[in-house]
């Protein structure tokens, strides 16, 4: 692995909370790695395991999912839906030979810019230490 390798990380962030936390971090000029790409979704409950698998298939080395704190979901129970789906996702990742540690989820409100910054730096450091995702060599397995 090259020393200057930068992990590609995709972040799916809830519009109502975590995306607001990202905005708060930006307004506060809090730094996090530029190789993290944020995708705004209306709710973490809208995130399907197929979204995460597609991110890995397209070259992501790690995936972050951010949602509202339990009990604070704009759509009442979206974050609980994500919590149920993540267990199924971990089983899929295991079958594909992808470490479940490559997926991180966190509850971050719009006012928690510092928590967002810390989460981004944490996933970056963790994925950087793990190295590139090996799925790229086994991409065909996702289509099966």
UniProtKB/Swiss-Prot annotation:
The keyword Zinc does not apply. Coiled coil: none annotated. One of its GO terms (molecular function) is 2 iron, 2 sulfur cluster binding. Keywords: 2Fe-2S, Electron transport, Iron, Iron-sulfur, Metal-binding, Oxidoreductase, Transport. Induction: By selenium deprivation. It comes from the Archaea. The F420-non-reducing hydrogenase vhc is composed of three subunits; VhcA, VhcD and VhcG. This is F420-non-reducing hydrogenase vhc iron-sulfur subunit D. The gene is vhcD.
